[in-house]
A protein has these predicted regions:
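Accessory terminal and edge-of-domain segments that mediate assembly/interaction
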Residues: 1-122, 128-288
Length: 288
């Protein structure tokens, strides 16, 4: 049944289906007009031809990661568009996209990347530690994200959890274990509140939630990718410890993080995506 036929069938039934009609119109995989605009936007924002995108995609907030990717592969095809930048390696079968910072941009790239029909997507993000046991340089594999960033409410009801794709997280965890790197798993808090470090009520709420860390993109990425039928995981790097005295990231400490830890972060992400590319194992997405 085509999308048009499905919509006409719903229109002919009773009035309990307007939400279903809205869902059909919103989702890229069920809306050819939206998909055409999304392809155009993805190419325009990244400067990347849609045919150059590989089926394994890494998402990042920072241009340093793209630079590291370009240095790793001599066949990298690197472009800068009007908003993002991207680089692809046919040899590695991986594309990396820098999409900016925040939940709105995360939701946008989550939808746009669905037109590539990737096998797997991995977000390499930075986060601020909440739990006292975490320190700068630690890795977190989130099992869920608290949806406090707002934009995900446009895609799913508030009671639906924001979850990564288990199998993507499994591949990443295997890479970490094989290289003898420790990591933590747990829930993270995704917020749109940038200077939360100075709000004591916000910080008290984080303790009540029992979250490991705070960041800005995971909930939006997990939600939009789920709705868009994209398999996504995340590997987060602790970049500061804002709950501790003098623990907030500064220009100086941020440069230290990039110098010491991000090369390993991108290396692990690339290896995980290459592992997914070379294995014939299919990553199934829940359908409804």
């Amino acid at each position: 049944m085509t999308q048009k036929e499905a919509i006409n069938e719903l229109k002919s039934e009773d009035s309990i289906h307007p939400r279903r009609l809205l869902e059909l119109s919103k989702r890229i995989h069920g809306n050819s007009a939206k998909k055409q605009i999304a392809v155009d936007m993805l190419e325009r924002y990244t400067g990347h031809d849609i045919k150059k995108f590989q089926k394994q995609i890494i998402l990042t907030n920072f241009h340093f990661y793209v630079e590291q990717f370009n240095e790793a592969f001599d066949d990298s095809y690197h472009t800068k568009g009007s908003a993002f930048q991207a680089s692809s390696s046919k040899k590695a079968k991986v594309t990396i996209v820098e999409f900016g910072v925040g939940s709105a941009m995360a939701a946008l790239i989550g939808e746009l990347i669905s037109v590539v029909h990737p096998k797997a997507v991995l977000f390499l993000g930075l986060c601020g530690a909440v739990h006292r046991s975490l320190k700068v340089g630690d890795f977190i594999l989130p099992i869920a994200a608290i949806r406090a960033e707002g934009v995900s409410n446009h895609f799913l009801p508030a009671q639906v959890p924001a979850l990564p794709t288990f199998k993507v997280q499994k591949f990443v965890s295997q890479i970490l274990v094989e290289h003898n790197y420790d990591y933590r798993t747990g829930t993270i808090h995704s917020t749109d509140f940038r200077f939360w470090e100075f709000d004591h009520r916000f910080k008290d709420n984080l303790i009540d939630e029992r979250v490991l860390a705070v960041e800005m993109e995971c909930a939006a990425l997990f939600t939009t990718c789920f709705v868009s039928k994209v398999n996504i995981g995340a590997l987060l790097l602790v970049s500061d410890c804002p709950m501790q005295k003098d623990g907030i990231k500064t220009k100086k400490s941020a440069s230290e993080v990039f110098r010491k830890y991000t090369s390993l972060h991108i290396e692990l992400g690339i290896q995980a995506m290459q592992e997914i590319a070379t294995r014939g194992e299919k990553i199934r997405h829940y359908t409804w």
